[in-house]
Amino acid sequence: MVGASEEAFAIIEPVIQTLAPENGYGRMGPPGSGHFVKMVHNGIEYGMMQAYGEGFEILRSSAEFDLDLHQIAEVWRRGSVVRSWLLDLAAHALEGDPDLSSLRGYAEDSGEGRWTVVEAINTGVPAPVITEALFARFASRQEESFAMKVVAALRREFGGHAVKTE
């Protein structure tokens, strides 16, 4: 994902060709375009990771079935429309720690997801999956959500709904 003039790209292409996998590089356009394409790529990655996470959580939460998530990941990564390198990584992680008990459900964002969402806003392009994946990362970092306390309080106040207390 290179952003460069055609002349500059012609000079650096032999080096990039040596380092990149076959057909794994290209000139995206003028200077800056490579960063832009990589930013959107990473935003898409946020959405894909979130979808995998949600899917595996649904599978794990099933009361009806005792599912082997590692086995499912292995099957999906070899013969499924959702196969990907990210799924390869999920299979590897689930093989060594099937419940992922060594991890906290905490995910930082490195900036590219935010930049992608800002670009979507600036250009008026709906990007609900990428936006929600970014917001899910924000939520993962909260010990206690004041917003959800307000929601619980309002539900209690207007409808007498049950709430959990400290």
Task: Show which residues each predicted segment covers.
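ATP-dependent carboxylate/acyl-activation modules
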Residues: 17-18, 156, 160-166
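Structural motif
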Residues: 23-26, 126-128
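A conserved hydrophobic position in a structured secondary element of the catalytic/binding core
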Residues: 4
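Phosphate/pyrophosphate-binding betaalpha-module
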Residues: 7-18, 25-28
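Conserved catalytic core of Hanks-type protein kinase domains
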Residues: 18-19, 93
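Helical "substrate-binding/catalytic lid" subdomain
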Residues: 1, 11, 32-161
